[in-house]
Regions:
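Peptidoglycan-targeting cell-wall enzymes and recognition modules
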Residues: 2-26, 54-165
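Sec/Tat-exported extracytoplasmic proteins
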Residues: 35-39, 53-57, 64, 85, ...
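Acidic helix/loop microenvironments that form the catalytic cleft of cell-wall polysaccharide enzymes
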Residues: 53-56, 177-195, 249
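Second-shell loop/turn segments in exported
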Residues: 10-21, 35-39, 48, 116, ...
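Basic/polar, cationic surfaces and motifs that engage anionic cell-wall
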Residues: 183-220
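Short acidic, glycine/serine/threonine-rich helix-capping segments at coil-helix boundaries
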Residues: 221-249
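Alpha-helical scaffolds flanking conserved acidic
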Residues: 4, 42-51, 178-185
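Proteins synthesized as precursors that undergo proteolytic processing into mature forms
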Residues: 158-162, 169-176
Length: 249
């Protein structure tokens, strides 16, 4: 695949403007190869992808989950697994592998704390694929084993492939086409954490890529019925404590 497979003129200088890293050209070449395979191929879709993935990965810098927590942080962030479980956090202070094997044990199809699955299947890629279950599903799509996928998602192509797999599985292109930054954020994050930063990068990306952003209008007089979608639906879902509040009824 190449830049010709995009439905707009995706030039090198655009990637340099959007990815403020010395290896921006490597990311550009990987994007030209991977993104069109998943139909992330219009200015609106690429802008949303770059904005959301850039936010989630610290500007395409973080491809592996950082679990280097202090004992104090463990008791604060993960009280269920430490303080409330009467587990001495001091024994896990700044030991990422031990921490992962506790907080990810016996869920997401992972084995128990002794299995090593928590560390093996910790967050990886720009959207932090996590858990044996998710690695297995992604690996099946890519025709590889979960163990191979663990290493693959920590490469540029693998990070993009895994993010695009998540993107496709969660129907995010429709939010891109509707220019619905709020809906896309909720689908990815489960809420609106970091929305201002995501929107700032999205507007910048739209400007660089030549997209025309228009804030979606919310019709508060509409009747919500099965098949309805959009910001109003998401608001109602939040008020009814329906999770995820993805704007789809």
């Amino acid at each position: 695949m190449a830049k010709e497979h995009f439905k707009f003129n995706f030039e090198e200088w655009m990637a340099e403007e959007l990815i403020h890293r010395e290896d921006w050209k490597d990311w550009y070449e990987a994007m030209c190869e991977i993104l069109p395979l998943w139909e992330v191929n219009t200015a609106e879709r690429v802008a949303m992808f770059v904005a959301q993935c850039g936010h989630e990965s610290g500007g395409f810098r973080v491809l592996s989950e950082n679990l280097n927590y202090s004992a104090k942080a463990l008791n604060t962030i993960f009280p269920k697994y430490f303080r409330r479980a009467n587990r001495d956090a001091n024994e896990y202070h700044r030991q990422p592998e031990k921490i992962a094997n506790v907080i990810y044990a016996s869920r997401m199809d992972n084995g128990d704390t002794d299995s090593g699955d928590g560390w093996r299947f910790r967050g990886g890629g720009i959207l932090q694929l996590t858990g044996r279950y998710n690695y297995t599903k992604f690996a099946e799509e890519m025709d590889m084993t979960p163990e191979v996928a663990v290493d693959y998602v920590r490469t540029k192509k693998g990070a993009l492939d895994s993010a695009c797999w998540f993107w496709d599985s969660n129907g995010l292109n429709k939010y891109c086409d509707a220019m619905d930054i709020v809906g896309a954020t909720k689908r990815i994050n489960g809420g609106t954490i970091g929305l201002d930063d995501r929107k700032k990068h999205y507007l910048h990306a739209m400007d660089v890529l030549g997209g025309d952003f228009e804030e979606p209008e919310v019709d508060y007089n509409q009747t919500i019925r099965q098949g309805s979608r959009g910001p109003l639906v998401a608001e109602v879902q939040e008020k009814l404590d329906i999770s995820p509040a993805d704007g789809i009824f």
